[in-house]
């Protein structure tokens, strides 16, 4: 499906459907008024019949409107003009797709005027991403994938010609971000017998082939891990026949404007049984999503390469599988991490932090200025923040504020939680430097405190996405979060200006 930006006369557009907005009390938008005048009041006369009130959720399809070349006009209710926000705007766009996608409509022109939720850049970007999200379908493995829509192209009409350049920039960014989000979802949704640590390494290597001028990939296998002393990482994978692989993706942009080295680390547990501290059976199938952090890093690197961002970005996919076996690590074991610090294992289901701690230490060789790890780390974060908000932890206030700003811009909600010294005491151990879990309270915080012990040499932030990375139930699947937030963070680091 293709997107286009242009400024056009709506009555002259030969298309299958034009979409325009209508507000409560049957108030027409400027685009709807234009079409109404061109059709000698035809739209107004139909609205007076009472078939659309202009409330959010209302839609009315008009056919063969006089003096209009489009085959159809879709009127979309937008509620009260002064009460439209980002959430309502997304719902409005979803309603348009619901009204269109099952019909034989191939080409659409959107002309949304009088909706002032943001400047033209954000308006266009939100439209494209929301429409793309509404049309996304999880790839099935049963060879019966059916095309869910007939839509071939969507044109966004820009009322003011002076806005065309900014609108085209917004479209370019939106399509790159959507590519990142879709790639993240598709990877996350794969079953664990397909997507294992080796498969993650293959996906990383594909990037070096597709973006060969900007991306170099190094794969750290178990032999190399042993040489590096990554004993915590190795221990987690010992119970599985699928050996761990850590994929290191190095992106170097052209004409770099920001000399900082930015690194992302993604937890890539392609399946987490919990190990000997085994998980309950009921929802264990969802533990294929325990690699959503790695998938998010993978997607974010795609966006950087697509837009040729003038940055240096490193992405680590920490691929591993936590299974029960005769070689599994045990509660009571003491592991020496790559950093030299020792960890007493009290629970083998607190494994993500063990994979991440060695990955974070490995990153030191690149002397990064900023490191952000992304992980479906703790159920405690879901208990604290629910399924709408991700947890944020950081050892640097400026970095934390930058991520919070990107969160506000993208409406991908995160909330900052503390790393006070009192919480570190929860990890005390009698026989090691510290244990891998606390005593049951503030689990999301103590997990972040654990990670912070391996991040002393750079500015670091941790995003716990355990509640936001996927949805359960009837429409289950990966959400693609927090990819847009991470992409926006990189765009901001690139000094892009939005007018």
Swiss-Prot record:
Origin organism lineage: Bacteria, Pseudomonadati, Pseudomonadota, Gammaproteobacteria, Enterobacterales
Cofactor binding summary note: Binds 2 manganese ions per subunit.
The encoding gene: pepA
Cofactors, names only: Mn(2+)
Entry binding sites for Mn(2+) 2: 267, 272, 290, 351
UniProt subcellular location: Cytoplasm
Matching PANTHER family: CYTOSOL AMINOPEPTIDASE, LEUCINE AMINOPEPTIDASE-RELATED
Catalytic residue positions: 279, 353
Function per UniProt: Presumably involved in the processing and regular turnover of intracellular proteins. Catalyzes the removal of unsubstituted N-terminal amino acids from various peptides.
Keyword tags: Aminopeptidase, Cytoplasm, Hydrolase, Manganese, Metal-binding, Protease
UniProt keyword annotation of Nucleotide-binding present: no
Protein family membership: Belongs to the peptidase M17 family.
Protein name as catalogued: Probable cytosol aminopeptidase
Enzyme class: hydrolase
One example GO MF annotation: manganese ion binding
């Amino acid at each position: 499906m293709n997107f286009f930006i242009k400024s056009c006369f709506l009555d002259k557009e030969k298309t299958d459907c034009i979409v325009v907005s209508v507000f409560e009390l049957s108030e027409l938008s400027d685009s709807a008024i234009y079409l109404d005048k061109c059709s000698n009041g035809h739209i107004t006369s139909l609205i007076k019949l009472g078939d659309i009130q202009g409330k959010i959720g209302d839609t009315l399809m008009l056919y063969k409107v006089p003096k209009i070349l489009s085959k159809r006009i879709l009127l979309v209710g937008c509620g009260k003009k002064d009460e439209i926000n980002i959430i309502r705007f997304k719902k409005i766009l979803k309603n348009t797709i619901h009204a269109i996608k099952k019909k034989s409509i191939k080409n659409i022109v959107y002309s949304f005027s009088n909706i002032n939720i943001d400047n033209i850049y954000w308006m266009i970007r939100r439209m494209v991403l929301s429409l793309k999200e509404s049309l996304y379908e999880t790839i099935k493995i049963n060879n019966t994938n059916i095309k869910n829509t007939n839509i071939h192209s969507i044109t966004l009409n820009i009322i003011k010609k002076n806005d065309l350049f900014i609108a085209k920039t917004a479209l370019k960014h939106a399509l790159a971000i959507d590519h990142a989000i879709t790639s993240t979802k598709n990877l996350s949704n794969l079953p664990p017998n397909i997507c294992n640590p080796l498969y993650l390494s293959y996906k990383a290597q594909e990037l070096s082939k597709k973006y060969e001028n900007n991306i170099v990939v190094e794969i750290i296998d178990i032999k190399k891990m042993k040489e590096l002393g990554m004993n915590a990482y190795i221990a987690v994978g010992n119970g599985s026949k699928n050996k761990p692989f850590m994929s290191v993706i190095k992106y170097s942009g052209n004409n770099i404007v920001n000399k900082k080295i930015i690194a992302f680390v993604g937890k890539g547990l392609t399946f987490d049984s919990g190990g000997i501290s085994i998980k309950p059976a009921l929802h264990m199938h969802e533990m294929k999503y325990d690699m959503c952090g790695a998938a998010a890093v993978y997607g974010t690197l795609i966006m950087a390469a697509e837009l040729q961002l003038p940055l240096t970005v490193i992405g680590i996919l920490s691929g591993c599988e936590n299974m029960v076996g005769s070689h599994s690590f045990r509660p009571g074991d003491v592991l020496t991490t790559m950093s030299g610090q020792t960890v007493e294992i009290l629970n083998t289901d607190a494994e993500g932090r063990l994979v991440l701690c060695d990955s974070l230490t490995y990153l030191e060789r690149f002397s990064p200025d900023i490191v952000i790890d992304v992980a479906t780390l703790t159920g405690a974060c879901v208990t604290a923040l629910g399924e709408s908000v991700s947890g944020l932890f950081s050892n640097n206030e400026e970095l934390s504020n930058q991520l919070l700003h990107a969160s506000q811009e993208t409406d991908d909600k995160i909330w900052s939680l503390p790393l006070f010294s009192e919480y570190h005491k929860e990890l005390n151990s009698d026989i090691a430097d510290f244990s891998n879990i606390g005593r049951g309270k503030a689990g999301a915080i103590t997990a972040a405190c654990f990670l912070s012990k391996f991040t002393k040499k750079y500015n670091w932030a941790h995003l716990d996405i355990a509640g936001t990375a996927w949805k359960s139930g009837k429409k289950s699947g990966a959400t693609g979060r927090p990819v847009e937030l991470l992409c926006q963070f990189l765009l901001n680091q690139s000094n892009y200006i939005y007018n």
